[in-house]
């Protein structure tokens, strides 16, 4: 999909090992949007702030949906993700930073709910599925997660107790179960004001139960 950020999600593969087809799912929404997992390059409607008014949600980098076939004939679906960053870029002052951080987390969670709707559709059809990419989020990554109950990663993995409805990522599981704060990381950032590095688990490969 074209992206206003000029950053489009790509898939590198060996054509001798995989046959790959771009396979967008969901119906394109109208300009007003849809509540029912529309195509990722259109508009999703979701009530971000519990005021009974749904807002328009869009991806600046729409997820890439592919149908893959191995040489042995195994078929699977892949969704490549680059979710919204929660960083309060451009906000000046502590209050503005907090306000923008919360607003960005709401939007990021809505994007993850949109992806989760798509995941549930694939699982209901019995598809083998991989969801992978940069979620710009992870279990326990910041204090604002407590306001919403779950991280975006947990939403995409699935919160229902039935294992048939859940995706699995062993690194995410380690982060969720860790009691001592020792978790895998996939990204490292330098915080200039504090003169230190910050490490986080932001990138995931989630697979269906099969």
State where each predicted segment sits.
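Divalent cation-coordinating acidic motifs and surrounding scaffolds
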Residues: 1-130, 135-210
């Amino acid at each position: 999909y074209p992206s206003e950020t000029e950053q489009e999600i790509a898939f590198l593969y060996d054509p001798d090992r995989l046959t790959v087809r771009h396979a967008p799912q969901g119906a394109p929404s109208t300009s007003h949007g849809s509540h029912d997992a529309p195509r990722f390059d259109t508009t999703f409607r979701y009530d971000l702030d519990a005021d009974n008014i749904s807002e328009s949600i869009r991806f600046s980098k729409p997820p890439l949906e592919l149908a893959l076939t191995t040489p042995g004939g195994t078929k699977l679906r892949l969704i490549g993700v680059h979710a919204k960053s929660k960083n309060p870029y451009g906000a000046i002052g502590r209050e503005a930073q907090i306000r923008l951080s919360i607003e960005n987390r709401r939007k990021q969670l809505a994007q993850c709910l949109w992806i989760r709707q798509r995941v549930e559709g694939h699982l209901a059809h019995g598809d083998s599925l991989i969801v992978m990419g940069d979620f710009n989020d992870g279990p326990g990554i910041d204090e604002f997660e407590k306001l919403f109950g779950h991280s975006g990663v947990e939403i995409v993995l699935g919160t229902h107790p039935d294992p048939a409805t859940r995706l699995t990522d062993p690194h995410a599981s380690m982060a969720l179960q860790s009691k001592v704060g020792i978790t895998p990381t996939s990204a490292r950032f330098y915080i200039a004001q504090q003169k230190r590095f910050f490490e986080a688990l932001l990138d995931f490969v989630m697979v269906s139960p099969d």
